[in-house]
């Protein structure tokens, strides 16, 4: 994982969501994405890459590529980072 030092990593200026995964599906995915996008707008850290990476189909692909059946996916967005972690 390549993490860039920015105000989000140093001071917590960013948004995150922890999404439950059951039977390979993200639970309440659209609600999580909507909440993240709202926070991203409020912090003024919107950019096209964030919109692409937070597309529901991209998130579902990430889950499938890792064969996640159960667990949690954490998504962190800061000014310079978009991180996905199990």
Which ranges hold each PLM region?
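Conserved alpha/beta cores of soluble small-molecule-handling proteins
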Residues: 1-86
């Amino acid at each position: 994982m390549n993490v860039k030092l920015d105000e989000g990593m140093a001071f917590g200026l960013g948004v995150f969501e922890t999404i439950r995964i059951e039977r390979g599906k993200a639970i309440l995915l659209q609600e999580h994405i909507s909440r993240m996008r709202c926070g991203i707008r409020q912090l003024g850290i919107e950019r096209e890459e964030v919109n692409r990476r937070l597309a529901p189909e991209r998130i579902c692909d990430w889950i499938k590529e890792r064969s996640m059946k159960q667990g949690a996916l954490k998504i962190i967005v800061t000014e310079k980072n978009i991180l996905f972690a199990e």
